[in-house]
Amino acid sequence: MPRPRSATCWAAAAGRWSCRLLALLLLLLLPGPSGGSEITFELPDNAKQCFYEDITQGTKCTLEFQVITGGHYDVDCRLEDPDGKVLYKEMKKQYDSFTFTASKNGTYKFCFSNEFSTFTHKTVYFDFQVGEDPPLFPSENRVSALTQMESACVSIHEALKSVIDYQTHFRLREAQGRSRAEDLNTRVAYWSVGEALILLVVSIGQVFLLKSFFSDKRTTTTRVGS
């Protein structure tokens, strides 16, 4: 029995909407063009690590960093423009964020220094955002406003970006907390072993001291013949 024409048209329209929705969801999941660098690296003691980024004039940039493990969880940070002018400089910071607008074209340099530390190396995370993310649906060559579905996709996209940022910060906090807990656990273990050794030495000393109190002291008399 042939299907009614209205039912066929309805099924075709539903199929087109399903395909369009699937395409939009895939667009949300695809990684967009990267607008910065996000790196976690090891910084040895008495060491300095620098990174370079080409930036065009007028671009808004944000540098955010945090020390995850090592020592007092602090590091020196310095940011310079292409002419060597210092834009940002902080000493022994655990975490910080700095936003600036590039005043000229060229290669900008930012360095992390652990030269003040002699024994401990650090694990440093930084996120250097250059410019703003491009819109999900570019406005060029568009003759109509965003549809309700496209607006919903834009809202979902922004919410997912916020979720990613929150997850990153929570992972950093978890890693730093775990490092502090492991460091505290190591110190407690060493302190416990030291206390046990001290108690053992004191106990042995008390045993020998008490033994010396109750030991028989015999004196020998030597008779000298005339």
From Swiss-Prot:
- Chief localisation class: endoplasmic reticulum
Lumenal compartment segments: 36-189
The record places the motif (COPII vesicle coat-binding) at: 213-214
Q: Where in the cell is it found?
A: Endoplasmic reticulum membrane; Golgi apparatus, cis-Golgi network membrane; Endoplasmic reticulum-Golgi intermediate compartment membrane; Cytoplasmic vesicle, COPI-coated vesicle membrane
**UniProt short sequence motif COPI vesicle coat-binding, positions renumbered to this chain:** 213-226
In the UniProt record, the signal sequence range is 1-35
Q: What membrane topology is annotated for this entry?
A: Single-pass type I membrane protein
GOLD domain residues are 48-130
TM regions (residue ranges): 190-210
**What SUPFAM superfamilies does UniProt report for this protein, alphabetically?**
Supernatant protein factor (SPF), C-terminal domain
Cite the Gene3D superfamilies for this sequence: GOLD domain (2.60.120.680)
Side of membrane Cytoplasmic, spans: 211-226
What is one Pfam family matched by this protein?
EMP24_GP25L
Q: Post-translation: what modifications?
A: N-linked glycosylated in complex form containing terminal sialic acid.
Please state which protein family the record places this protein in: Belongs to the EMP24/GP25L family.
Which proteins does it associate with, and in what oligomeric form? Answer: Predominantly monomeric and to lesser extent homodimeric in endoplasmic reticulum, endoplasmic reticulum-Golgi intermediate compartment and trans-Golgi network. Oligomerizes with other members of the EMP24/GP25L family such as TMED2, TMED9 and TMED10. Interacts (via C-terminus) with COPG1; the interaction involves dimeric TMED7.
According to its UniProt entry, the function of this protein is described as:
Potential role in vesicular protein trafficking, mainly in the early secretory pathway. Appears to play a role in the biosynthesis of secreted cargo including processing and post-translational modifications.
Q: Return the protein name.
A: Transmembrane emp24 domain-containing protein 7
